[in-house]
Amino acid sequence: MNTPKKHKKFKAKMILQIIMVIIGGIIAAYGLETVLIPNSVSDGGVTGLSIVGSQLFNLPLGILIAVINIPFVWLGYKQIGKSFALLSIIGIVSLAAGTSFFHHTPAIIEGDTLLITVVGGIILGFGMGLALRNGGALDGIDMLAVLLSRKLPFGTSDLILFLNLFVFIFVSTVFGLQGALLSVIAYYIASKVIHVVEEGLSGSKTFQIITTQPELMVETIRDQLGRSATYKEAYGGFSHEKFKEITCVINRLEETKLKEIINDIDKTAFVTVYDVAEVKGSNFRNLNHH
């Protein structure tokens, strides 16, 4: 009975994802063509290889981005699924078309290398992060890294770094050593922006707290942050004492306040903090600050 309604909702969500992936591709293309490439700064991954090929053989950048990414999109289809591959194709086509559209647009920044790498990295990272957040990708090298990590005794992040090392060596043959180093910096900034856009500024964190005053700690967290917490019975390996370990998941924006609460109640508390990829259930997103 609810099937037509669910189908309509899914269709609307898919259309929104497609629009956002297209916007992401266009933004990334703008960053490349108006900030990075005019100042001899490249990107990593397939886009970086495409930029090198474009400069060496005087071929349109958009065509190279589209062609070189084809096998990687196929890998994405095999590893992740049809929806991801479709959105990635849309994103890559948008990026490729965007580079052609903005190719003759004057550079918005020139001369200041620090500003170029920072602004270029931010624009590029925002575009790529927007695509990833909505289920697509603008560069295929990550898909290759995932496949290789299943065959080799290395993690995905290590392989991405290793593969990009070769990309930046190629970049140095076109843009020189300085251009390659600036490209590394821009790539690093872009990767951080991608993480922020994909996960959001308000990503979650888990605090594990061992304190002599667990009841007061939990009560204060509830009253001041509006957050619940759970107890877990733990046993000290050195002291052989039983104690209550508190686990509390908070919004990243609440981190400073929680640290203040912990410090006020028990300066000797043992605290472990780690990032959380996703939180579901209950009313976690509803803040109730006092």
From Swiss-Prot:
A Gene Ontology term for the protein's cellular component: plasma membrane
Keywords, ordered alphabetically: Cell membrane, Membrane, Transmembrane, Transmembrane helix
Domain of life where this protein originates: Bacteria
InterPro entries: DUF2179, N-reg_PII/ATP_PRibTrfase_C, UPF0750_membrane, YitT
TM region positions: 18-38, 56-76, 83-103, 112-132, 165-185
Locations listed in the record: Cell membrane
Membrane topology term: Multi-pass membrane protein
Family annotation (PANTHER family): UPF0750 MEMBRANE PROTEIN YDEO, UPF0750 MEMBRANE PROTEIN YITT-RELATED
Family statement drawn from the similarity comment of this UniProt entry: Belongs to the UPF0750 family.
Record protein name field: UPF0750 membrane protein YdeO
Gene, per the UniProt record: ydeO
